[in-house]
Amino acid sequence: MGIQFSVKSVFASATLLLVATAAHAGITTYTSQSSYLAAVGGTGVDTFDDLDVSDYQGPLTRSAGSYAYTVGTGPNSSQIWGASDDYSDIWLTGGNRLDLVTFAPSTPLAGVGGFFFGSDLFGFSTPASYLTLSATDSAGATVSYRLNTPTFNSFVGFVSTGNLVSFSVTAGNQPGVWATVNDLHLSVATAVPEPETYGMMLAGLGLLGYIGRRQRQRA
């Protein structure tokens, strides 16, 4: 009876911990590409290198690896531009510097990220004071992050315990600066054992401990 009480107590504590974790579910912000990748499962990347340095009528339907999404801009212009410093590494920006560039995954995804910086009227990278990035998930949670003095290598990623439904970036009203994204990352969640699996693991550990004690008593 004592062993049964012990296992049940541990299992109950673990269940309460899982419930408490779920109650604080939401969106986590990452500013390191390696940390972001460590927090997600499979990831696809859209490099935008198939785009011409030209304008496109949005919204566009694209994919990052096997993960489809749409990208649009607004409210002032629906134009989307492929842009570059060297016509080799292409990035994506909007047609109006005041607009939001918004990404919407077509399938349930847990993470979105990329490299964010400013570009000028001609699409060349340019210094920006800040960019504002926002993500919303299927539970209604929304997180905004202000990326100060972004550079070409500034990475930001969002990971949700639910499914992300939209992600946007804007440069606000900074003269001569357009919000720009390169190497968009879309990711599924890391596989996490179900509560039942945790319970089986804990019960198994309790049984192993009991067997070990019985063997020592017999020795």
Where are these regions (language model features)?
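Surface-exposed, well-ordered secondary-structure segments
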Residues: 26-189
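N-terminal signal peptide c-region/cleavage motif recognized by signal peptidases
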Residues: 20-22
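Short, charged juxtamembrane terminal tails flanking transmembrane helices
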Residues: 215-219
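Sec-dependent N-terminal signal peptides
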Residues: 10-17, 203
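A short, hydrophobic C-terminal helix/tail in secreted or cell-surface proteins
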Residues: 193-213
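Bacterial N-terminal signal peptides that target proteins for export
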Residues: 2-11
